[in-house]
Amino acid sequence: MKKLNICIDIDGTITDPYYWLSYANNYFNSNISENQVTSYDISKVLNIKQNDYLEFYEKFKFEIHTNQKLRPDVKDILDELYKFNNLYFVTAREKSLELVTFLYLLNHEIPFDEIYILGTHNKVPKAKDLICDIFIEDSYDNAIELSNSGFKVILIDTNYNRLPLNHNIIRAHNWMEISQIITEISIEKEAI
Protein backbone atom coordinates (compact mmCIF):
# COMPACT_ATOMS: atom_id res chain seq x y z
CA MET A 1 0.00 0.00 0.00
CA LYS A 2 1.30 3.45 -0.89
CA LYS A 3 1.93 5.88 1.97
CA LEU A 4 1.11 9.42 0.86
CA ASN A 5 -1.10 11.10 -1.72
CA ILE A 6 1.18 13.73 -3.23
CA CYS A 7 -0.29 16.37 -5.54
CA ILE A 8 2.20 18.17 -7.77
CA ASP A 9 1.86 21.25 -9.92
CA ILE A 10 3.79 21.23 -13.22
CA ASP A 11 4.78 24.67 -14.52
CA GLY A 12 7.47 26.24 -12.37
CA THR A 13 7.31 23.31 -9.96
CA ILE A 14 8.80 20.40 -11.87
CA THR A 15 9.86 22.66 -14.75
CA ASP A 16 12.19 25.65 -14.96
CA PRO A 17 10.05 28.55 -13.70
CA TYR A 18 11.69 31.02 -16.10
CA TYR A 19 11.77 28.95 -19.31
CA TRP A 20 9.13 31.17 -20.95
CA LEU A 21 11.28 34.27 -20.43
CA SER A 22 13.44 33.95 -23.56
CA TYR A 23 10.28 33.58 -25.68
CA ALA A 24 8.73 36.65 -24.06
CA ASN A 25 11.90 38.74 -24.34
CA ASN A 26 12.15 37.93 -28.07
CA TYR A 27 8.46 38.52 -28.74
CA PHE A 28 8.18 41.79 -26.80
CA ASN A 29 11.71 42.96 -27.61
CA SER A 30 12.49 43.23 -23.90
CA ASN A 31 15.43 42.26 -21.73
CA ILE A 32 13.84 41.02 -18.49
CA SER A 33 16.12 38.87 -16.33
CA GLU A 34 15.07 36.01 -14.02
CA ASN A 35 15.78 38.27 -11.02
CA GLN A 36 13.16 40.72 -12.31
CA VAL A 37 10.43 38.06 -12.33
CA THR A 38 9.07 39.00 -8.90
CA SER A 39 5.37 38.52 -9.68
CA TYR A 40 3.41 35.46 -10.78
CA ASP A 41 1.50 37.80 -13.13
CA ILE A 42 3.62 37.74 -16.28
CA SER A 43 1.91 40.79 -17.82
CA LYS A 44 2.95 42.76 -14.74
CA VAL A 45 6.54 41.50 -14.99
CA LEU A 46 6.73 42.50 -18.66
CA ASN A 47 4.83 45.76 -18.05
CA ILE A 48 2.35 44.97 -20.81
CA LYS A 49 -1.43 44.73 -21.13
CA GLN A 50 -3.03 41.41 -20.17
CA ASN A 51 -4.46 41.05 -23.70
CA ASP A 52 -0.96 41.41 -25.19
CA TYR A 53 0.29 38.67 -22.90
CA LEU A 54 -2.66 36.41 -23.80
CA GLU A 55 -1.94 36.93 -27.51
CA PHE A 56 1.71 35.95 -26.92
CA TYR A 57 0.69 32.91 -24.86
CA GLU A 58 -1.79 31.67 -27.47
CA LYS A 59 0.94 31.87 -30.09
CA PHE A 60 3.65 30.06 -28.09
CA LYS A 61 1.90 27.92 -25.45
CA PHE A 62 2.35 24.59 -27.25
CA GLU A 63 6.01 25.25 -28.02
CA ILE A 64 6.78 26.47 -24.49
CA HIS A 65 5.00 23.58 -22.77
CA THR A 66 6.58 21.03 -25.11
CA ASN A 67 10.16 22.28 -24.79
CA GLN A 68 10.43 23.57 -21.22
CA LYS A 69 13.25 22.11 -19.15
CA LEU A 70 12.85 20.06 -16.00
CA ARG A 71 14.26 21.38 -12.74
CA PRO A 72 17.40 19.57 -11.52
CA ASP A 73 16.85 16.20 -9.79
CA VAL A 74 13.09 16.11 -10.50
CA LYS A 75 13.11 12.85 -12.46
CA ASP A 76 15.22 10.88 -9.96
CA ILE A 77 13.27 12.12 -6.95
CA LEU A 78 9.88 11.46 -8.53
CA ASP A 79 11.07 7.96 -9.49
CA GLU A 80 11.86 7.31 -5.82
CA LEU A 81 8.68 8.93 -4.48
CA TYR A 82 6.54 6.92 -6.91
CA LYS A 83 7.72 3.63 -5.39
CA PHE A 84 5.99 4.37 -2.08
CA ASN A 85 3.46 7.15 -2.77
CA ASN A 86 0.64 8.13 -5.12
CA LEU A 87 1.73 10.94 -7.44
CA TYR A 88 -1.01 13.13 -8.90
CA PHE A 89 -0.19 16.00 -11.24
CA VAL A 90 -2.72 18.78 -10.66
CA THR A 91 -2.26 21.71 -13.02
CA ALA A 92 -4.18 24.88 -13.82
CA ARG A 93 -3.34 24.41 -17.50
CA GLU A 94 -6.25 24.72 -19.91
CA LYS A 95 -7.81 21.62 -21.49
CA SER A 96 -6.25 22.40 -24.90
CA LEU A 97 -2.89 21.45 -23.33
CA GLU A 98 -4.00 18.00 -22.17
CA LEU A 99 -2.19 16.01 -24.88
CA VAL A 100 0.94 18.19 -24.71
CA THR A 101 1.04 17.71 -20.93
CA PHE A 102 0.60 13.95 -21.13
CA LEU A 103 3.26 13.60 -23.85
CA TYR A 104 5.67 15.87 -21.97
CA LEU A 105 5.52 13.66 -18.88
CA LEU A 106 5.82 10.47 -20.97
CA ASN A 107 8.72 11.80 -23.06
CA HIS A 108 10.59 12.76 -19.89
CA GLU A 109 9.68 9.42 -18.29
CA ILE A 110 8.08 11.14 -15.31
CA PRO A 111 6.09 8.64 -13.23
CA PHE A 112 2.55 9.45 -12.12
CA ASP A 113 -0.73 7.86 -11.15
CA GLU A 114 -3.04 10.47 -12.70
CA ILE A 115 -2.93 13.88 -14.39
CA TYR A 116 -5.64 16.47 -13.74
CA ILE A 117 -5.84 19.44 -16.14
CA LEU A 118 -8.13 21.80 -14.26
CA GLY A 119 -8.26 24.91 -16.42
CA THR A 120 -8.47 26.91 -13.17
CA HIS A 121 -6.14 27.91 -10.35
CA ASN A 122 -8.63 26.66 -7.75
CA LYS A 123 -6.97 23.38 -6.80
CA VAL A 124 -8.64 22.90 -3.40
CA PRO A 125 -11.58 20.76 -4.63
CA LYS A 126 -9.24 18.36 -6.47
CA ALA A 127 -6.89 18.18 -3.47
CA LYS A 128 -9.92 17.24 -1.34
CA ASP A 129 -11.05 14.61 -3.87
CA LEU A 130 -7.57 13.06 -3.86
CA ILE A 131 -7.26 13.17 -0.05
CA CYS A 132 -4.00 15.04 -0.60
CA ASP A 133 -1.34 14.69 2.11
CA ILE A 134 1.18 17.06 0.51
CA PHE A 135 0.80 19.55 -2.34
CA ILE A 136 3.96 20.73 -4.14
CA GLU A 137 3.41 24.13 -5.72
CA ASP A 138 5.23 27.25 -6.99
CA SER A 139 2.31 29.70 -6.93
CA TYR A 140 2.15 31.66 -3.69
CA ASP A 141 -1.60 32.33 -4.05
CA ASN A 142 -2.32 28.64 -4.67
CA ALA A 143 -0.13 27.68 -1.70
CA ILE A 144 -2.00 30.07 0.61
CA GLU A 145 -5.41 28.88 -0.64
CA LEU A 146 -4.46 25.20 -0.21
CA SER A 147 -2.85 25.73 3.19
CA ASN A 148 -5.83 27.75 4.46
CA SER A 149 -7.98 24.76 3.50
CA GLY A 150 -5.88 22.50 5.73
CA PHE A 151 -3.42 21.04 3.23
CA LYS A 152 0.31 20.81 3.90
CA VAL A 153 2.10 22.61 1.05
CA ILE A 154 5.71 22.51 -0.06
CA LEU A 155 6.36 25.80 -1.88
CA ILE A 156 9.33 25.49 -4.21
CA ASP A 157 11.29 28.72 -4.09
CA THR A 158 11.12 31.19 -6.98
CA ASN A 159 11.71 34.93 -7.28
CA TYR A 160 7.93 35.45 -7.52
CA ASN A 161 6.82 33.63 -4.36
CA ARG A 162 9.06 35.08 -1.64
CA LEU A 163 6.29 36.29 0.63
CA PRO A 164 5.39 35.37 4.24
CA LEU A 165 4.31 31.76 4.79
CA ASN A 166 1.81 30.29 7.21
CA HIS A 167 2.20 27.20 9.41
CA ASN A 168 1.02 24.76 6.70
CA ILE A 169 3.57 25.88 4.10
CA ILE A 170 7.20 24.75 4.00
CA ARG A 171 9.59 26.47 1.60
CA ALA A 172 12.01 24.25 -0.33
CA HIS A 173 14.79 25.59 -2.52
CA ASN A 174 15.18 22.51 -4.73
CA TRP A 175 13.93 18.99 -5.28
CA MET A 176 16.53 17.46 -2.95
CA GLU A 177 14.99 19.51 -0.11
CA ILE A 178 11.51 18.46 -1.23
CA SER A 179 12.57 14.82 -0.98
CA GLN A 180 13.89 15.34 2.56
CA ILE A 181 10.71 17.14 3.67
CA ILE A 182 8.50 14.36 2.27
CA THR A 183 10.62 11.73 4.01
CA GLU A 184 10.18 13.57 7.33
CA ILE A 185 6.42 13.92 6.81
CA SER A 186 6.15 10.24 5.88
CA ILE A 187 8.03 9.20 9.05
CA GLU A 188 5.80 11.47 11.17
CA LYS A 189 2.67 9.98 9.57
CA GLU A 190 3.86 6.42 10.28
CA ALA A 191 4.56 7.33 13.92
CA ILE A 192 1.01 8.56 14.47
Task: Please give the residue ranges for each predicted region.
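Substrate-recognition "cap/lid" segment bordering the active-site pocket of phosphatases
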Residues: 94-145, 149
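Short, acidic loop-to-helix structural element flanking the phosphoryl-transfer center
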Residues: 62-89, 94-102
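Short acidic-hydrophobic, aromatic-tinged amphipathic segments that line or gate anion-handling sites
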Residues: 115-119, 169-177
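Short amphipathic alpha-helix with an adjacent loop that forms part of the alpha/beta core around
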Residues: 125-129, 178-190
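Acidic, Mg2+-coordinating phosphoryl-transfer loop and its flanking beta/alpha structural elements
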Residues: 135-173
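Metal-dependent phosphoesterase signature
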Residues: 40-76
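Active-site neighborhood of HAD-like aspartate-dependent phosphohydrolases
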Residues: 1-53
